[in-house]
Amino acid sequence: MIDNVNHTASSRDVVERLRMEIDAIDDNVIRLLEKRFALSRAIGEEKKKEKREVKDGKRETFILEKIEKLAPEYNGEIALLYARLFELSRGLQA
């Protein structure tokens, strides 16, 4: 019985440590998203000057293909996130 209790405490420690790693990653992701959104807004201003369409299907396809190569194991999940990211970026560019 004692071994089971120690194992449970150890598992909790592992989960807590892993969550702390995720929290640190999230902090970085948030900072990078802020930068990405600022760049998207700047791109939108340049597109307005040139009277270009906000949506750039070729660029989005290029990014999705790059994701497929860089992260084949999580390609579907990352592609879903990027689909939403594209929508948000287009909103900032409009």
Model-derived segments and spans:
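Domain-level signature for soluble enzymes in the chorismate/prephenate branch of the shikimate pathway
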Residues: M1-A94
